[in-house]
Design a protein with these regions (language model features):
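N-terminal leader/signal peptides at the extreme start of proteins
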Residues: 1-10
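Short, surface-exposed interaction loops/tails
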Residues: 3, 38-43, 54-57, 63, ...
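Hydrophobic single transmembrane helices highlighted by the model
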Residues: 11, 15-16, 36
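Alpha-helical hydrophobic helix detector
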Residues: 16-32
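Conserved catalytic core of two-component sensor histidine kinases
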Residues: 19, 46, 53
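Aliphatic-rich helix starts adjacent to a transmembrane/signal segment
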Residues: 32-50
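Short, glycine/small-hydrophobic-rich surface segments
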Residues: 56-97
Length: 142
């Protein structure tokens, strides 16, 4: 009695079908995942801006006003040395560190008239203005 030996493995046709199905899935799924990256970055920027705005409000409560444009957001991490000096700056600061926006650009802070400021991320293009993912993301204090 002789046994027929069958080799194990996949046929070329089976491999081609699997590759085709994987390629089809990749073309459907990839665009959806890629679009989520920009959405996630914008969401992170909004969250960062909210955290920085909260720290700015705490600074104002302690010192009577927001930091000047010249003092900038660094006044939330290290005690300002340029006038007007803070009256009651918290030991340890208001933030551990200044985050960069999700595109690696520093957030922009400008102190406006009495008790007001503008705070923003310049978006993916790191330039003023823009559309879509390049649009600026703003946070304002009334």
């Amino acid at each position: 009695m002789t046994r027929q030996r069958r080799s194990s493995g996949y046929t070329l046709l089976e491999i081609m079908v699997v590759v085709f199905i994987l390629g089809l899935l990749a073309t459907i799924v990839a665009p959806r995942i890629m679009g989520r990256t920009d959405e996630a970055r914008r969401t992170k920027a909004v969250a960062d801006l909210a955290g920085i705005a909260q720290a700015l409000n705490l600074y104002r409560l302690d010192n009577g006003d927001y930091p000047t444009t010249e003092q900038g957001l660094e006044a939330l991490v290290e005690r300002p040395t340029a006038p007007p000096l803070p009256k009651a700056w918290r030991a340890g600061g208001y933030l551990d560190h200044l985050p960069a926006d999700p595109w690696g650009t520093p957030y922009v802070y400008v102190r406006l008239a009495a008790q007001r400021y503008t705070l923003k991320s310049l978006g993916s293009d790191a330039a003023e203005g823009g559309d879509g993912t390049a649009a600026d993301i703003d946070a304002h204090a009334n």
